[in-house]
Amino acid sequence: MAPKPNSDVTTKRWWEEYHRCRGVLVKQLRTEKGWTEAELAKRATVSIQWLRALEGNRLKSNHRMQHEMQVISALGFGTYEIKDFIGRVEDMVKETLGPPPWLKPAQADTSERPSK
């Protein structure tokens, strides 16, 4: 039995995929620029270990959002362009899982009803 569209399980799975895709996109953008992990870490003023954890989806829940923003900024996304980065991550997740479960309409009862 598949989880309901708006269940805690599907919401958790969506966010797990979001965080995975975020790391994939950071790594993709870094390699497109021809930068090593060390170079991006230096530009973003974060440790190489932290950057590796971001790219490998191994950040703990207490990671600092400031570090994440420093990395995104170092990749060329300004304050007003961060939504573009987030949009790209969301598009990657939608390709895998579809839209966020909290945006999916409730599953309608599709059983056929007898006609009168």
Task: Name every feature range the model reports, one short phrase each.
Residues 33-54:
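Short alpha-helical DNA-recognition segment
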Residues 27, 38, 69:
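Residues within the helices of the helix-turn-helix
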Residues 47, 58-59, 89:
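The DNA-recognition helices of helix-turn-helix-type DNA-binding domains
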Residues 2-32:
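A short, Lys/Arg-rich alpha-helix, primarily the initiator
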Residues 69-89:
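Intrinsically disordered, low-complexity basic tails/linkers immediately adjacent to helix-turn-helix/homeobox/MYB/SANT
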Residues 7, 83-116:
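Short, charged recognition helix plus adjacent turn
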Residues 34, 42, 57-73:
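Short, basic-rich loop-to-helix N-cap that marks the start of a DNA-contacting helix
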